[in-house]
A protein has these predicted regions:
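Short, compositionally biased
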Residues: 84-107
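Extended boundary segments
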Residues: 1-47, 119-120
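Residues that flank catalytic or metal-binding motifs in active/ligand-binding sites
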Residues: 38, 73, 94
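Glycine- and charge-enriched low-complexity intrinsically disordered segments
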Residues: 103-124
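Short alpha-helix capping/helix-loop boundary micro-motifs
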Residues: 60-67
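Short, basic/aromatic beta-hairpin or loop at an interaction surface
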Residues: 43-58
């Protein structure tokens, strides 16, 4: 079954450089094996990366054994929905590319919360 975005449309690519996604296919695709629900396409910020590291999830350090290049500020990445929600609750949520964010995210986060942090192409 095709993964859809939060609007019910085809899921757009989040990032191919760095190559992101649970399946490392550039999209925030998911299935039942994705226990972390890596479904939110974010644009990482320095504040968010610091928050994530201080919360025990270091996204900045490369981990080649997991095919993980490390995330830098300004890069797009498929983030776990619960991690985004935690950052949101702590006023550190990164911007979100809604068209590339999987509709499964809505099981954890409301569309209104995502829209508050929506990144639009005109802002790039």
């Amino acid at each position: 079954m095709e993964n859809k975005n939060v609007f019910g449309d085809s899921l757009m690519i989040c990032s191919e450089n760095p190559l992101t996604g649970y399946f490392r296919d550039g999209c925030c695709n998911t299935d039942d094996t994705d226990l972390g629900l890596h479904t939110v396409c974010i644009i990482a910020s320095t504040d968010f990366l610091i928050f994530s590291t201080e919360s025990g999830n270091d996204l900045s350090t490369p981990r080649p054994e997991f095919n993980f290049p490390g995330v830098k500020s300004g890069e797009k990445w498929c983030l776990c929905a619960l991690r985004w929600k935690e950052a949101y609750q702590n006023n550190c949520a990164p911007m979100v590319v809604l068209e590339a964010t999987n509709e499964k995210t809505l099981e954890v986060v409301t569309l209104d919360e995502l829209i508050e942090h929506a990144h639009y192409k005109a802002e790039i």
